[in-house]
A protein has these predicted regions:
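Acidic-basic catalytic patches of nuclease active cores, encompassing PD-(D/E)XK
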Residues: 1-37
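Short amphipathic alpha-helical segment that frequently serves as the phosphate-/nucleotide-binding helix
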Residues: 15-16, 43, 76-80
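Active-site metal-binding core of divalent-cation-utilizing nuclease and nuclease-like domains
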Residues: 28-55, 70
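Hydrophobic beta-strand scaffold residues
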Residues: 29, 90, 113-115
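Active-site-proximal loop/turn and secondary-structure-junction residues that shape catalytic pockets
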Residues: 35, 65, 120
Length: 132
């Protein structure tokens, strides 16, 4: 499976690998795109916005990495909910050994999350690119 050979060690690296994958697929990628404010006033930013250069179809990606179990996992449902307020479709891309099996199951069940190692085929289907 594409991506399996790439070991992700932190959140910044996950974002970098997502952007690199987008470029390999011929997509534009913009990082830390501001999209208004959250209800309590904090700026809402999307980690990565992908744009198909011909169709201009867009997709926002939140990149979540967790190396050990802990409270960061508890914030994921709020992230899934926050994506609903974006002006474009969105997805959580997650990686790391710190996500419990229950959280992995929850994320996948929402239809709004994908593990990094499964991102390439997901993006190909979403943007209408060749599956190779």
């Amino acid at each position: 499976m594409a991506g399996r050979a790439l070991a992700v060690s932190n959140g910044e690296e996950l974002t970098r690998l997502v952007v690199a994958l987008a470029h390999q697929l011929g997509l534009e990628a913009k990082e830390q795109v501001k999209v208004a404010r959250r209800i309590w006033g904090a700026e809402r930013r999307i980690d990565v916005v992908l744009i198909h250069p011909a169709s201009r179809k867009t997709l926002g990606l939140e990149c979540k990495f967790q190396s050990v179990g802990g409270s960061a996992e508890e914030k994921i449902p709020a992230t899934i909910k926050d994506i609903e307020a974006w002006p474009i479709p969105g997805l959580v891309v997650f990686a790391g050994p710190g996500f419990s099996d229950n959280m992995r199951g929850f994320l996948i069940s929402t239809g709004k999350a994908v593990e990094f190692e499964e991102l390439r085929p997901w993006l190909c289907l979403y943007f209408g690119l060749a599956l190779d």
